[in-house]
């Protein structure tokens, strides 16, 4: 039996910024991003003694962007439910190679300049923070890239859709060169956590496998 996870990827952790900062409809997106970023960043710094870091800024920026995306997602779901003729696409795939999420999320929100300014105020640059994010190792082949392209197309066309897959801990191999030879080691992409996930322990699903082991 597996717990459910919701992943916002253009869309838990105690470092999540307060969603109340985003819920107020009178706050525009620019102000919301800045306030949510600062709130999460302060929570990060409470756990640190060495000052600002790209890692802390990554978590702050990801959570701030996720909250804004979540508000859009909630409104979209409400509109779809109100439209009784709307159908949904449920896309199942063993792999999803979505790439790094923060850059896509900020671009979708149209807030790159605002995030860049917030990071510079914290002594960090946007390229350095984006580089800190690990690629989501949820597969290693063309099937995963194709699935990601389908989801991007659904979003571009405005089609109500969800992607369902497997949350691999070691979905890829990390390549290393030692003694002039190439070697592979498991890519533990979750070792620092994933700011885009929302753990949902109240939901459980039985996963069955056919066949037998000899």
Indicate where each model-derived feature is located.
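A conserved ligand/cofactor-binding region detector
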Residues: 5-214
């Amino acid at each position: 039996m597996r717990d459910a996870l919701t992943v916002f990827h253009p869309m838990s952790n105690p470092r999540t910024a307060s969603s109340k900062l985003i819920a107020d409809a009178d706050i525009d997106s620019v102000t919301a991003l800045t306030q949510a970023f600062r709130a999460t960043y302060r929570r990060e710094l409470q756990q640190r003694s060495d000052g600002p870091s790209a890692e802390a800024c990554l978590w702050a920026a990801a959570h701030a962007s996720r909250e804004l995306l979540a508000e859009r997602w909630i409104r979209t779901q409400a509109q779809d439910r109100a439209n009784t003729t709307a159908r949904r696409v449920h896309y199942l795939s063993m792999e999803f190679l979505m790439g790094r999420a923060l850059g896509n999320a900020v671009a979708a929100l149209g807030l790159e300049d605002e995030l860049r300014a917030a990071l510079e105020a914290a002594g960090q640059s946007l390229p350095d923070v984006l580089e800190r994010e690990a690629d989501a190792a949820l597969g290693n082949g063309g099937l995963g890239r194709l699935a990601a392209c389908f989801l991007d197309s659904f979003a571009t066309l405005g089609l109500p859709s969800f992607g369902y897959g497997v949350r691999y801990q070691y979905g890829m191999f990390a390549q290393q060169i030692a003694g002039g030879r190439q070697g592979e080691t498991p890519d533990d992409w979750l070792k620092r956590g994933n700011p885009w996930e929302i753990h949902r322990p109240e939901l459980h699903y039985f996963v069955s496998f056919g066949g037998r082991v000899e």
